[in-house]
Amino acid sequence: MATGTPAAELRELTEEELVTRLRESKEELFNLRFQMATGQMDNNRRLRTVRHEIARIYTVLRERELGLAVGPDAGDAA
């Protein structure tokens, strides 16, 4: 069962919110890697989930950059 954020939910966020989520996820990944190195990690699956979430965020940002998808505030500008 996936516990990460679905891509559809990420597509509803603004770019600022995506960048904030990306920063938070990267910080969490750093902490998880530190826990793994010190032998304190209790949930190895979380490491993979966070990496996948980071990839999803990058994918949504890239889709917007290429014009394949528009953000939620793009429709209000017209």
Swiss-Prot record:
GO terms for molecular function: structural constituent of ribosome. SUPFAM superfamilies: Ribosomal protein L29 (L29p). It holds the Pfam family Ribosomal_L29. It comes from the Bacteria. One of its GO terms (cellular component) is cytosolic large ribosomal subunit. Keywords: Ribonucleoprotein, Ribosomal protein. One of its GO terms (biological process) is translation. InterPro entries: Ribosomal_protein_uL29, Ribosomal_uL29, Ribosomal_uL29_CS, Ribosomal_uL29_sf. Coiled coil: none annotated. The keyword Mitochondrion does not apply. NCBIfam families: L29. Belongs to the universal ribosomal protein uL29 family. This is Large ribosomal subunit protein uL29. The lineage of its organism: Bacteria, Bacillati, Actinomycetota, Actinomycetes, Mycobacteriales.
